[in-house]
Amino acid sequence: MNFADNLNSIQQRIRAACQRAGRDENSVMLLAVSKTHPAEMIQEAVRAGQTFFGESKIQEAKAKIPNCPGKARWHFIGHLQSNKVRDAVELFEMIQSVDSLNLSREISKRCQQAAKTMPILMEVNVAGEASKFGYQPEQLLAELKEINALPKIEIHGLMAIPPYTTEPEKAR
């Protein structure tokens, strides 16, 4: 099965799930995780109709994104270190993994310098796993007002990865 066939299959599943849930399918964004895949594969995906791509490593994105011009739109989905924020602001249209007040401040600072507004998702560690990044829910609530007041960033929601379970309903 080629990428176009896979994409079509996934889109059909999304449509069916939206119909079951009474949700508008246009409200769902399919983000293809492109990490470790070469630019040629991303170009094939774009030709097949995929628009949004997620990268989790700044160095890989710096090498790949310039080789994928056109309709591709890029989101950062990995753990972001403060010293990589400048590059992230330059390369991406959204950062989906903001996990601290200090990181929020740095993104705001770099966005002000770049005259760019960055949509962000706040990463929440819902499982409470020490090995995972993200806010503890109580900590996020305590800092949210200050983060929301920072210039040049817009909180668009939360990003959370539930703990692994063999029972999908437990992950909801």
Regions flagged by a language model, labelled:
Residues M1-R172:
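Conserved alpha/beta-domain cores
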